[in-house]
């Protein structure tokens, strides 16, 4: 399997619960390296641009409102099969359907406040990483 990079966001609900370290431990325990990381409080404009793919969906406004409701942790994860590995760690979008032991099953409250975001494909990951991290701010290790 190839070494990949994927974007991960710890959303405002999980940041407010003070579980950033527990989530980072899961990434690292699964063999993923954190090669870039920063905390940010997204502006409405940034959240709307980042989630533009969902602009026509009925949940778009609520998603943007949620993502700007508090700070988020944004990180780039690197490792073999990083995209799928991160998605497996996150669990199903709806925490009620997420497998026990996944990030969403353990830390999320609802399908809206679902603790984490992760890129769904290599193409998406490249676009999402570039959105938050200029290349010079991502470091292989």
UniProtKB/Swiss-Prot annotation:
Top-level enzyme category: transferase
Chain positions recorded as ATP binding sites: 11, 59, 87, 93, 104, 114
GO molecular function: ATP binding; metal ion binding; nucleoside diphosphate kinase activity
GO biological process, one term: GTP biosynthetic process
Compartments, record wording: Cytoplasm
EC identifiers of the protein: 2.7.4.6
The keyword Cytoplasm belongs to this UniProt entry's keyword annotation: yes
A GO cellular component annotation in the UniProt record: cytoplasm
Cofactor(s) this protein cannot do without: Mg(2+)
InterPro entries: NDK-like_dom (IPR034907), NDK-like_dom_sf (IPR036850), Nucleoside_diP_kinase (IPR001564)
Chief location bin: cytoplasm
Protein name, UniProt field: Nucleoside diphosphate kinase
Gene symbol of the encoding locus: ndk
